[in-house]
Amino acid sequence: MYFLSGWPKRLLCAPRSPAEAPLHVQSDPRRAFFAVLAPARLSIWYSRPSVLIVTYKEPAKSSTQFGSYKQAEWRPDSTMIAVSTANGYILFFHITSSRGDKYLYEPVYPKGSPQMKGIPHFKEEHCAPALNLEMKKILDLQAPIMSLQSVLEDLLVATSDGLLHLIHWEGMTNGRKAINLSTVPFSVDLQSSRVGSFLGFADVHIKDMEYCATLDGFAVVFNDGKVGFITPVSSRFTAEQLHGVWPQDVIDGTCVAVNNKYRLMAFGCASGCVQVYTIDNTTGAMLLSHKLELTAKQYPDIWNKTGAVKLIRWSPDNSAVIVTWEYGGLSLWSVFGAQLICTLGGDFAYRSDGTKKDPLKINSMSWGAEGYHLWVISGLGSQHTQIETDLRSTVKEPSILLFQFIKSVLTVNPCMSNQEQVLLQGEDRLYLNCGEASQAQNPKYSSARAERMPRHEKSPFADGGLEAPGLSTLLGHRHWHVVQISSTYLESNWPIRFSAIDKLGQNIAVAGKFGFAHYSLLTKKWKLFGNITQEQNMIVTGGLAWWDDFMVLACYNLSDCQEELRIYLRTSNLDNAFAHVTKAPMETLLLSVFRDMVVVFRADCSICLYSIERKSDGSNTTASVQVLQEVSMSRYIPHPFLVVSVTLTSVSTENGISLKMPQQARDAESIMLNLAGQLIMMQRDRSGPQIREKDSHPNQRKLLPFCPPVVLAQSVENVWTTCRANKQKRHLLEALWLSCGGAGMKVWLPLFPRDHRKPHSFLSQRIMLPFHINIYPLAVLFEDALVLGAVNDTLLYDSLYTRSSAREQLEVLFPFCVVERTSQIYLHHILRQLLVRNLGEQALLLAQSCAALPYFPHVLELMLHEVLEEEATSREPIPDPLLPTVAKFITEFPLFLQTVVHCARKTEYALWNYLFAAVGNPKDLFEECLMAQDLDTAASYLIILQNMEVPAVSRQHATLLFNTALEQGKWDLCRHMIRFLKAIGSGESETPPSTPTSQEPSSSGGFEFFRNRSISLSQSAENVPPGKFGLQKTLSMPTGPSGKRWSKDSECAENMYIDMMLWRHARRLLEEVRLKDLGCFAAQLGFELISWLCKERTRAARVDNFVVALKRLHKDFLWPLPIIPASSISSPFKNGKCRAVGEQMLKSQSADPFITPEMDAGISNIQRSQSWLSNIGPTHRDTDRASSPGPQMQDAFLSPLSNKGDECSIGSATDLTESSSVVDGDWTMVDENFSTLSLTQSELEHISMELASKGPHKSQVQLRYLLHIFMEAGCLDWCVVIGLILRESSVVSQLLGIAQSSEMDGEMLQNIKSGLQAVDRWASTDCPGYKPFLNIIKPQLQKLSEITEELVQPDTFQPVTVGKTPEQTSPRAEENRGSCSHGSISQSEPGSNNVVSRKEEDTTQADEEEPLQDGAYDCSVS
């Protein structure tokens, strides 16, 4: 449709006196010239360029006689202008060219420029002509002239004495008498008796009138406010032959404008609304079609303060109407009442500082060529508001403004390829939506489709230039792809009249005054006619369309005076030699393409179907056209100009199931004709004998005749249908989509029986469903259930002009207008309409076919929300509520629980009871979420329960959710649940918490330990670091002053309740040997792990089975079991050849079976200083830097492996850089030694095997921290298990030191001893890789055994089972409460002990380099 663009322009015509101020503008029939009236002046302006050509100035003496000029009317051939004056005179001016071939303005080109050579009519078209104005005739009608209208070769004039004068353009009445309106009979319709009521008042006269050619009559407004339509009942224009009809409910008419294409009469009223009437074809009565009025909802401040409607003007293509009011303002509407623009609100009405502007007052306006410009005579400021004195400047004086518009190509060229793309055309540029529709909506579909496409057909936005990653391409941003029309073509062919885009959105064709040109988005180039004479000899009359690589256009050949249908190939030169030309008997008005058929509508009201076929003749590719069928529509179409669009479709009243052959469902089943807003369908007559199609060629077969037309809908502006087929989405692809202006949209939907059962004969097979949308539709994405459109947006720049003198600038008075893309989902409207009509089965089939759309959950939510809002807020009881039906419908989908709770969260609390009465008890829905493991949705239901139930119920359900979240490791949710439980206990549960984010927490894999990291859950949540706990939506919790009101008793009780749940979970994790989960749990929730382990040292924190624990840790931390290298028997490390290298390479392992005791002692000393304590200092940062991929480069040593099937082939030499914990100094040693030593294959193999026996670097960091934690807590048996995995002999040495220096529990030492013995037995039988390390620590084990025998009596060597008492009865929960209630959360400062965060960059690569356990376990650590 029409959209404002940029700022308006002001033409330079500053009046020197009030007599020179412009007051009226009127365009000629071709809209190339504009007559501008001042009180004593007549000026002629040219449209492009917008320049003044000639001015006639009335002498003072005659000006006093005639009075000031009032109105102007052009003769149809633009050779004369009639001007009415205030004293009842009509002045006839002749327009003549001055002195032959002279031009007022000529473009100057350099010599030899191609523009000067051989362009026919170049000067006429491209130069402003020099004209003369000469007054030829003066006619005195002796009464003030109210209106004058050009009717064919006559001028119809209405005067204030109630007379109608029919005057010839030469200024003569030809003896015809004036008609007295009081003698014209009026009635409500033409079927009433011939003698109707008369006006009957002597002072009644016509105030405004306009002739309607397609209705053959005049729409009139009388001075008493009544409106009517006067039509001659025969060809003679006399009082006896005129009859009038009027609507009885309009008494405040002010002005009128007529739409010839849609046969509409728009009457402006004093109330500020516009009433649009049409004529009933059968009775002749005036029927109200629709109203154009501002609503209080959209414009609460101004809707009833606009004053009377002052002017109404229909656009040149009759698809839009512009309205202005007495107190100022401008509004633009589509033909059937969809509002497009209004300047009484938003940035048009308010400055950036919030102050109100005076609305623009308009005295006169007229549309320019093709509707690209609106010429406006602006008046003085608003009359009913105080005018600021400093604004009395030139802008407040009457001036000529040019508003610029861009419009949809559907207004003039509604061919099918234009219906699936949004294409707007401006005066010199085109706007199209980026990307292919199907590709942008469905990336998977688009990629598959792109693979099937030939290379030359792929969209430029799919590969190469611009990318279409998904929905964002078509919907996610507001920008257009702007194509500048070739200036060479525009120079001689302005204005652009038609545009068309192909189905893939790659090629665009435009047609102006002569010829046409096309543009490729792939090559970014225009292609024009090489022979300019061929271009200038062709006028495109009926539009143009794309068929594959061909342009199909209907044109008039000027040289042969012949109507033609031409087809040009895109890839060949633009020349008539490569065109296929078919002569046509009559002028073609409309053209469209359906599959391999072309349908044209001609001026004789006939429709002709052509078949089009590609033909290859050697290197030349052409297309041939054959006539298939002609259909005469003259019986049904009163005037050919009334046809808005003609379309071939496969749509019929019977859906594809009931047709006799499947081919018929894809054929051109019917013709859709938009006749002045009435959608008429003619489908093929299949009642008679069918034609066999087996043997006949499809282009030569005889086609079935068409049935008589059937009216499908009224007030139709645009029609969308597709020729594609998709079995999964038949409802959407076989439907017919209609745009009905202010009434919204309609869809003619097919109804299919379930499972292809035979349909019932008494059931309709299609249904028309109306629905409202908030945008003006320009394209329908059938498979994606989306409507695309465009909307005007505004940008204020008045803040840039601060000087008072600059406040008169147009940039200050008007905002800058831009056009933005927009879209809307319509699926929920259709589903609702089907449910209203008890067609739930059809609604379910339709919804299931669209369930894969990414916004389908939003569709269900929208439907539920709209029905809930309407029914729950209704003032009157609803006899048959729809909400239960909608609720039952949504339960058919797995998204039911999310849909309900999201709808509730976006709805007022007062409506919840009504909602849950229909969908079910929120407690039951919460439990369903828990059963389905949908914890985020359950958390949302918890907020509902908090507001609808007592705190005890909320606590019960919150506890269930908390325990489940703990088990699943949803740490963000756990944190929110802790706060939520505290809020309930604090008595502040009235505050409705908000939903946690539904996304997966990013920190679910890792844990962060700090040196003093224990966090007391007894503290308030204000201390929680915002970076760690802050989310977009959080469960609410009292903060600030309200937190101080908590009683200490309730705080202690709540904290105890929460701590008991945390202790229980930690105990379960430890008993199930889930150390990694325990570490994540403690780090994420700030659990006091060390203090808790101290209490559980001899109970839950005791290792019962060392072998099982060892296996589980290997599995959880992706740590490979140790292996014995194949070449270990002849290892180079037995001699001292590689002693330096060996020392450095084995620092991190210190457990090689061939290391001497002296080496072992040295290495253990290094390890003791670099184990966990160094990991949290600067040294470990260096380790990270060395072992993580960084800017510094390190060598990777590769060696061929001797036995590919052997277990040792798992190791990779690249593990050296990914998994090793060698520090920077060690790398220097390695590089130096390896550069000087020549290692054999067996030596490299040995190093590789050693590296292969280590796990990921991150796992190593985590295990060392856990080792540190257990050591601090005194859980020495767990220390031994972790030390075994890391093969740290220093752990056993430390254990010995502790056992010797302090009194240790004998049971623990005995447990360690028996556990190590069990590991030794397991290693002997199942894992010999552990044997070398066990041999290394054998002396320490022997010493440990001696200490054990000293501490423990012989009778205590029996197996001991430690009882695990439940925490409910254990005094442990209370005995150390004081120690658990202090501490603070450590902020993650730059210098703090947060190591894991520094290691994050290594995560991916370290894990990828562990092929042993690849894909077996999840090791995502944040």
Swiss-Prot record:
Residues 1378-1396 have a biased composition (Polar residues). Expressed in the eye lens. WD repeats lie at residues 64-103, 304-343. The modification Phosphothreonine is found at residues 991, 995. Residues 449-460 have a biased composition (Basic and acidic residues). Pfam families: Beta-prop_RIC1_2nd, RIC1. Its main location: cytoplasm. Residues 1403-1412 have a biased composition (Acidic residues). Forms a complex with RGP1; the interaction enhances RAB6A GTPase activity. Interacts (via central domain) with RGP1. Interacts with RAB6A; the interaction is direct with a preference for RAB6A-GDP. Interacts (via C-terminus domain) with RAB33B; the interaction is direct with a preference for RAB33B-GTP. Interacts with GJA1. The RIC1-RGP1 complex acts as a guanine nucleotide exchange factor (GEF), which activates RAB6A by exchanging bound GDP for free GTP, and may thereby be required for efficient fusion of endosome-derived vesicles with the Golgi compartment. The RIC1-RGP1 complex participates in the recycling of mannose-6-phosphate receptors. Required for phosphorylation and localization of GJA1. Is a regulator of procollagen transport and secretion, and is required for correct cartilage morphogenesis and development of the craniofacial skeleton. GO terms for molecular function: guanyl-nucleotide exchange factor activity; small GTPase binding. The lineage of its organism: Eukaryota, Metazoa, Chordata, Craniata, Vertebrata. GO terms for cellular component: cytosol; membrane; protein-containing complex; Ric1-Rgp1 guanyl-nucleotide exchange factor complex. Keywords: Cytoplasm, Guanine-nucleotide releasing factor, Membrane, Phosphoprotein, Repeat, WD repeat. GO terms for biological process: intracellular protein transport; negative regulation of protein catabolic process; positive regulation of GTPase activity; retrograde transport, endosome to Golgi. Belongs to the RIC1 family. It is found in: Cytoplasm, Cytosol; Membrane. It comes from the Eukaryota. The keyword Cytoplasm applies. Residues 442-462, 986-1005, 1021-1048, 1179-1198, 1355-1422 are annotated as: Disordered. It comes from Mus musculus. This is Guanine nucleotide exchange factor subunit RIC1. Disulfide bonds: none annotated. The keyword Membrane applies. The modification Phosphoserine is found at residues 1014, 1016, 1018, 1036, 1171.
